[in-house]
Structures are given as structure tokens and as C-alpha cells.
Swiss-Prot record:
Keywords, in A-Z order: Calcium, Cytoplasm
Superkingdom of this protein's organism: Eukaryota
Gene3D superfamilies with a match to the protein in the record: Metal Binding Protein, Guanine Nucleotide Exchange Factor, Chain A
GO molecular function: calcium ion binding
Primary location recorded for the protein, binned into one broad class: cytoplasm
Record's protein name: Translationally-controlled tumor protein homolog
Domain TCTP span(s) in chain numbering: 1-168
Keyword Zinc-finger assigned: no
GO CC terms in record: cytoplasm
Function: Involved in calcium binding and microtubule stabilization.
Species of provenance: Oryza sativa subsp. japonica (Rice)
The keyword Cytoplasm belongs to this UniProt entry's keyword annotation: yes
One Pfam short name: TCTP
Gene that produces this protein: TCTP
Family to which the UniProt record says this protein belongs: Belongs to the TCTP family.
């Protein structure tokens, strides 16, 4: 299995269990998330509670919770939304920090295409949710989520150059 870690923080953000599509000249990866129900355990023991006078389930209070698979699996932490100024400030810092970690070839490719990806994200800014890795480190990359028209499950966006592939 391959795990993709944030190049700046080491947080696990994605794995090959979630297929991605490259967009914006390969700068962004688009990944489909899914809402899943977690925690509900329905055990049928074959008893008939109404015949025994117990109409209510007297077992444990087992609450079903809906979570997004990617957020839950990688313990992503949602952040407050960014306005345009905050987003541009973040991007400038992120580009500077990430560029320093890339080899010359990847650095050139990243700098050549990041402007288009930034404009793409700015165009969706009001619809984006922002997530960071489990460590919640300020200098780490962001993971973005949004809902495509008519979709009930979120789509996630990752900066491909900000991910490091690790075999598990």
C-alpha cells in the first residue's frame, strides 16, 4: 500500500486506496470522498422484545455517525474558511516553503503551473472546505473539499507536489 504524506509536516493525507485524477497540469489531484456511517452496530439476538414487555431497546446507546471516509481515515482537521486575502497569503507562504523542499526539476514544474492552480482554487473559494493534517501544523499543506454540482459526496483537492509517496 502507498501512503501520501504532507512533504512539510509528515502527516498522512491520502493513500492509494483512494484513486486520484490529475487536474490543472498535474498540480492538483482530485479525489472522490464518500459519506459513510460509522459506529452503528445492529445486533439481532432473535428475541421478541414486544412479547417480553420490553418495547424499548435497553442495550447500549449506540449512535450512528456519518463521516467522510477520507477525513476519518486520515484524521483531517477542518479549518475555518479563508477569505481571498487569507488564501493568497497562505499560498505565498506555502509556495515558498514547498519550493525549498523540491528538487530543481519539480520546483520548475511547480512554479510554472501553480499560478493556474491557484486561480482555479480562487474561483471555487466560496465553496471550499479547508482541512489540515492531524498535527494541525501551520506550515503544512491544505486539503480542499467541495461538492460538484448535484453531488452528495465531497471531492477533495490535494497539491500533488506537496505529497511524498511512502510504501507501507
Amino acid at each position: 500500500m502507498l501512503v501520501y504524506q504532507d512533504l512539510l509536516t509528515g502527516d498522512e493525507l491520502l493513500s492509494d486506496s483512494f484513486p486520484y485524477r490529475e487536474i490543472e497540469n498535474g498540480i492538483l489531484w482530485e479525489v472522490d470522498g464518500k459519506w459513510v456511517v460509522q459506529g452503528a452496530i445492529d445486533v439481532d439476538i432473535g428475541a421478541n422484545p414486544s412479547a417480553e414487555g420490553g418495547g424499548d431497546d435497553e442495550g447500549v446507546d449506540d449512535q450512528a455517525v456519518k463521516v467522510v471516509d477520507i477525513v476519518d481515515t486520515f484524521r483531517l482537521q477542518e479549518q475555518p474558511p479563508f477569505d481571498k486575502k487569507q488564501f493568497v497569503t497562505f499560498m505565498k507562504r506555502y509556495i515558498k516553503n514547498l519550493s525549498a523542499k523540491l528538487d530543481a526539476e519539480k520546483q520548475e514544474e511547480f512554479k510554472k503551473n501553480i499560478e493556474g492552480a491557484t486561480k482555479y482554487l480562487l474561483g471555487k473559494l466560496k465553496d471550499l472546505q479547508f482541512f489540515v493534517g492531524e498535527s494541525m501544523h501551520d506550515d503544512g499543506g491544505l486539503v480542499f473539499a467541495y461538492y460538484k454540482d448535484g453531488a452528495t459526496d465531497p471531492t477533495f483537492l490535494y497539491f500533488s507536489h506537496g505529497l511524498k509517496e511512502v510504501k507501507c
